[in-house]
Each structure stands twice: as C-alpha cells, then as structure tokens.
C-alpha cells in the first residue's frame, strides 16, 4: 500500500477529499442531440466515484444554446438537462464522493457546422480565426458580452441550486471563449475588454465575480492553460504577466481552487522538451499560495504524480493531480494507485464515440477492488 502524499486528506470547498487524485474534465460526446446527459454518463461518473472521497470534474458543459458548439455535448440551461445532471450528482454523492460541473462557452473554437445547423454564427473576442484559412468569427458587442456573463451566472445557479453540484469550474483554458479574451493572440480589442493586461482579464474576472456572488466563493474554481498552443493560444509576448495578474485577482476573490494544465496535447510537443523557465507552471503555483487547493494536469502517470506531490511540491498539501486518459480506462484509479496495481491501457479509438457506452462504461474494475464489493464504498 502506498504511503505517498497522494493519499493525504485535503480540505476542498465545503468538503474534505480523501486523496489528491482528480478526474479531469473531458469532452466525450455522450449527451443526446438536445444536450441532455444520457444514462451512460450517470454510470461513467458513478464508476469513477466508487472510491469514497474522490473529486470529479464533469465534461465541459454548454451554459446556453449559443455555446453548444459541438454535437452531443451536454448543457445546463433547461429543466431536462438539469434533471438528468441531478441524477448524476445524486449517484456520485451516494458513493461518498464529490462532483463539480465545468461551465463552458466555445467561442471561435466551435464546430461551424454545429453552429449553422442551429442558426448560430461563429463569435469571439475579436475577428481573428483559430488559424489561417479557418473561418473568421465576428467580434461580440457590449450587450452580447454582458449577456454571456449573465449566462455563466445562470449556468452556475442551475448546476449548484438546481442539480446539486458541489461547485462549478469556469473553463478558462484551451482556447475557448474566456481564453480568447484573456490572450492577445486572439483579443485585438481596444475597448474595456482588450488592449491591456487588465482589460483582457476583465471578461473572465467579471464572470468569476458574478458566479461567486451567485453560488459562493467556496463553490467556484477556474481552469487555465497558460502554455497550451492548442487552438491558437500560448503565443503572446506578455503571457507570464497576463496570467500573473489574472491569477492574483482570482486569489483575491478567494475562490475554491485553481486548475492549471500543462501543454500536453496530441499535436503538441511533450512539455519536457520545452525550455521556458516558467513552462511547467511553477511560477503560478507559487503565486497561488498554500491556502486553497491547486489542481495540476498534464499527462501524469502514477510515477510522475507521486513525484509531483512527494518531491516537487513536498512542502505543501494543496497540490492535487488531475488524470484524464488513465481515468478513462481505470474507473478504480485511486484504489489501483494506492495498492500499486497495474493500470489498464486506454483505447483512443473509443474516446469520442457519440451516444455510446463503448470505451466509456465498459472498462472493468480490478479483482482486488471487486473483492471489497460488499462495502458501500472503498475507503480512499
């Protein structure tokens, strides 16, 4: 049995986690055509909640119809969606675990066909495409920006007060709408929403303030990916000062946590060969401090996760490790890591099969876990 700091308890929002292994938010296309979570989703999250005291973060969830930028992604704006999510939340809570919903708006990163089929147009902070040759979005006007802020707030209320989620994570990463305002590689505005570090930060911060006012500071997290070049991001000259300012403002709001992702994407370089001294987010981790949890994501495996908490950040108990792909294929991942049990391999070909349980809910639990199935949940 592991003695790693991975298995220390951690205060988190209004709860206490039994370990530091977190399910990553992942877009898996398992909602129906109307954005209602299918029954597979309840099974998926219940499986990964089976080790008591686990933190799960959901798929990216569209906050309103205009943000449903891909087919078969879930939403949180109507009663059918909220009711389906409540079933998911209740199942996770019955296992003694916790679940936060990720609030999402795609902006220029949406699938154009998915938008046009709904009579919607591509939009962003500025008229800058994701890449040369890609469709050019239109720039949001003042009224539309204010409406987006209200939509985030309503999405948070629907999640926490309607569906019973423990909290919400604002998706400010990976080149989606909040990131499109935050980074000058996309944001070319000259009004109060662009042109300076403070103005580029305004959209994300106004969303955060509104959501905090709606559901409470200890029910709000933020995900950022400063170094990711995915979807045209991560190329601005003043990247570190931009994110230093933004993170400082988030810390002053005393939100529940910060979630940082390293640049580890299919079409990008391995982060180990990137040479910028701040690339692995240590600067931002130090800025965040030790008072509130910080989630770190970036292709971690059992060994690198242990090194992260036992060596790199051994002086703090607030660093949690986010797993995506390994959690797909190992629903009992915290149990396996604690007991030193080998991980099952994942199958990329089944990551994104719409409306299907294949590669989603059919990975088995290990024998050692099943031997304890007479317990309501396994102690984390």
UniProtKB/Swiss-Prot annotation:
Coiled-coil region(s): none
GO molecular function: FMN binding; NADPH dehydrogenase activity
SUPFAM superfamilies: FMN-linked oxidoreductases
Binding-site positions, FMN: 25-27, 60, 102, 171, 223, 299, 324-325
UniProt entry tagged with the keyword Flavoprotein: yes
Binding residues annotated for substrate, in chain numbering: 171, 174, 352
Annotated Pfam families: Oxidored_FMN (PF00724)
Keywords: Flavoprotein, FMN
Family according to the record: Belongs to the NADH:flavin oxidoreductase/NADH oxidase family.
Reported function: Probable inactive dehydrogenase; part of the gene cluster that mediates the biosynthesis of fungal ergot alkaloid. DmaW catalyzes the first step of ergot alkaloid biosynthesis by condensing dimethylallyl diphosphate (DMAP) and tryptophan to form 4-dimethylallyl-L-tryptophan. The second step is catalyzed by the methyltransferase easF that methylates 4-dimethylallyl-L-tryptophan in the presence of S-adenosyl-L-methionine, resulting in the formation of 4-dimethylallyl-L-abrine.
Name of protein: Probable inactive dehydrogenase easA
Organism the protein comes from: Claviceps purpurea (strain 20.1)
Lineage of origin: Eukaryota, Fungi, Dikarya, Ascomycota, Pezizomycotina
């Amino acid at each position: 049995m592991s003695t790693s700091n991975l298995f220390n308890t951690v205060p988190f929002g209004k709860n206490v986690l039994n370990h530091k292994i977190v399910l990553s938010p992942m877009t898996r296309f398992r909602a129906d055509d109307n954005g209602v979570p299918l029954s597979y989703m309840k099974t998926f999250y219940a499986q990964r909640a089976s080790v008591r005291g686990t933190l799960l973060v959901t798929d990216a969830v569209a906050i309103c119809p205009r943000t449903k930028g891909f087919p078969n992604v879930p939403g949180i704006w109507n009663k059918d969606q909220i009711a389906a999510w409540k079933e998911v939340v209740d199942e996770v809570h019955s296992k003694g675990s916790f679940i936060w919903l990720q609030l999402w708006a795609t902006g220029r990163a949406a699938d154009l066909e998915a938008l046009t089929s709904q009579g919607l147009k591509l939009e962003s902070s500025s008229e800058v495409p994701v890449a040369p040759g890609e469709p050019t979005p239109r720039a949001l006007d003042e009224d539309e920006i204010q409406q987006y802020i209200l939509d985030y707030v309503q999405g948070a209320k629907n999640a926490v007060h309607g569906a019973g989620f423990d909290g919400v994570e604002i998706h400010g990463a990976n080149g989606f709408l909040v990131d499109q305002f935050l980074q000058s590689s996309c944001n070319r505005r000259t009004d109060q929403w662009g042109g300076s570090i403070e103005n580029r930060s305004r959209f994300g911060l106004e969303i955060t303030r509104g959501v905090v006012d709606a559901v409470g500071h200890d029910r709000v997290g933020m995900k950022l990916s400063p170094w990711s070049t995915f979807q045209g991001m991560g190329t601005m000259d003043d990247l570190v000062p931009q994110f230093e300012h933004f993170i400082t403002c988030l810390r002053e709001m005393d939100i529940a946590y910060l979630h940082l992702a390293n640049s580890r994407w299919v079409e990008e370089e391995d982060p180990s060969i990137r040479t910028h001294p701040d690339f692995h987010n240590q600067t931002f981790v130090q800025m965040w401090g030790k008072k509130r949890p910080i989630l770190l994501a970036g292709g971690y495996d059992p060994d690198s996760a242990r090194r992260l908490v036992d060596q790199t950040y051994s002086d703090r108990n607030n660093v949690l490790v986010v797993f995506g792909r390994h959690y797909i294929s190992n629903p009992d991942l915290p149990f396996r890591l604690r007991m030193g049990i080998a991980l099952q391999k994942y199958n990329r070909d089944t990551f994104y099969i719409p409306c299907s349980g294949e590669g989603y809910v059919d990975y088995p639990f290990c024998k050692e876990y099943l031997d304890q199935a007479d317990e309501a949940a396994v102690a984390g």
